[in-house]
Amino acid sequence: MHIANKHFIVSGAASGLGAATAQMLVEAGAKVMLVDLNAQAVEAKARELGDNARFAVADISDEQAAQSAVDAAVSAFGSLHGLVNCAGIVGAEKVLGKQGPHGLASFTKVINVNLIGSFNLLRLAAAAMAEGAADESGERGVIINTASIAAYDGQIGQAAYAASKGAIASLTLP
């Protein structure tokens, strides 16, 4: 896919890999909707990237919030051609530590953001891309999910993170 003049959503775009991805896309001529839960940081990053960047504050694991972010991108740009899922959190906790077994709530939180959130945004963005016209190559869009080496080589004290990234890798490969 040629990036220039295409419209993307990047999740986790306020910092790190998401911010770098959004910057690369804007520099390549794309328009980008930066999505993040951190309102101040995502607004500042969008402002820094200029006129081809917009932002939406959203918890991507929430169906309505993710749909609002997709709708905002389509409303701002007229169509959607790509999604890059970079949103993710790390929970440092051993399965069995000195304080007892891994907390289920903390495990669930990481899975909700990293896996459920990524899938939620993926399915909603795919629906928006399917509504658009195919380009000269017959493409309607592209979806890129980011994982981690932890998907294949789990890390001590990061069971939830490794499990979520393994699931993202499995979800992406078919």
Where on the chain are the PLM-derived regions?
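The beta1-alpha1 cofactor-binding region of Rossmann-like NAD(H)/NADP(H)-dependent oxidoreductases
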Residues: 39-40, 57-69, 104
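Conserved glycine-rich Rossmann-like NAD(P)H-binding loop of the short-chain dehydrogenase/reductase
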Residues: 28-44
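Active-site loop-to-helix junction immediately N-terminal to the catalytic Tyr of the SDR YXXXK motif
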Residues: 154-162, 171-174
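Canonical Rossmann dinucleotide-binding motif of NAD(H)/NADP(H)-dependent dehydrogenases/reductases
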Residues: 2-33
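Conserved mid-core segment of classical short-chain dehydrogenase/reductases
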Residues: 90-108, 131-137, 157-160
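Residue(s) in the substrate-gating loop at a strand-loop-helix junction
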Residues: 148
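Active-site helix of classical SDR
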Residues: 122, 164
